């Protein structure tokens, strides 16, 4: 890449070239895929191994306030035909305690969906599906179901909350593994997920959708840039630079220049970013 161009300065072919490298695992791309309720339903039917489940409501970037009034944004929150809730999260980097993130999300959804004056037995079931590029439990399975078990008896007990961890690292020839392959290499149309792959190709080829994706990426990048300038922290700037390289296809030098990193500090940033 020889220099940074704003979306308004790019030709359609340049936009298509940029979008061609995006995958379903990328935050903004995943968000656009989940705006289609039928696509969300297709994905969940494969992961939950339930071909009859129906998604009644699907909200990408669902915002829920915690007890302190701070808004937490979920990647997508769905409600099915049985009134059960399902939060789907996608994660590329192994950089946090993901099990605690799942626990936190489930608690927020339970608080959000519990109506005042109702008995606990009326609390809706909550499922969190955590999709990652890495194997959270490092046990060579493409999918893990986490159950509550009584230690003394080995009995499985239910409280309406469940967790499923799916990863794209382990290839085991299952339907879930095949779906995950498409999440990380989102090109062409895939028989196992026709609705998802059709929508992917629409956003990678059609002028309106290609431009929309590019503009969303630019908006996210500019918001991150302002955040980095306001914070003034080197660690935050490094994270944003890495995002520019990974998600926007910028060279490391162009990303540093965009973040207004002095020329004499670029090598230090490169070393700390490990790029």
Task: Locate the predicted segments by residue.
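Accessory alpha/beta interaction modules
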Residues: 1-159, 172-174, 227
């Amino acid at each position: 890449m020889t220099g940074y161009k704003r979306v308004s300065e790019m030709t359609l072919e340049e936009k298509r070239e940029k979008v061609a490298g995006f995958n379903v695992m990328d935050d903004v791309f995943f968000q656009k895929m989940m705006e289609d309720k039928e696509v969300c339903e297709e994905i969940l039917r494969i992961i939950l191994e339930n071909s009859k489940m129906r998604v009644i409501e699907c909200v990408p970037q669902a915002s829920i306030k915690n007890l302190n009034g701070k808004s937490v944004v979920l990647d997508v929150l769905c409600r099915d035909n049985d009134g059960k809730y399902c939060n789907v999260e996608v994660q590329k980097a192994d950089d946090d305690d993901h099990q605690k993130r799942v626990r936190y999300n489930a608690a927020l959804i339970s608080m959000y969906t519990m109506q005042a004056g109702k008995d606990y037995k009326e609390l809706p079931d909550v499922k969190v599906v955590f999709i990652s590029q890495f194997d959270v439990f490092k046990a060579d399975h493409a999918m893990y179901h986490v159950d509550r078990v009584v230690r003394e008896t080995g009995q499985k007990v239910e409280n309406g909350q469940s967790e499923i961890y799916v990863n794209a690292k382990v290839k085991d020839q299952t339907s879930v593994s095949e779906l995950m392959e498409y999440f990380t290499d989102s090109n062409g149309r895939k028989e196992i997920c026709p609705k998802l792959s059709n929508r992917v190709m629409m956003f990678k080829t059609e002028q309106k959708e290609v431009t929309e994706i590019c503009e969303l990426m630019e908006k996210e990048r500019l918001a991150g840039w302002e955040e980095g300038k306001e914070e003034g922290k080197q660690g935050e700037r490094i994270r944003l630079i890495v995002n520019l390289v990974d998600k926007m296809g910028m060279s490391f030098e162009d990303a540093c220049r965009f973040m207004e990193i002095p020329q004499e500090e670029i090598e230090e940033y490169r070393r700390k970013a490990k790029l």
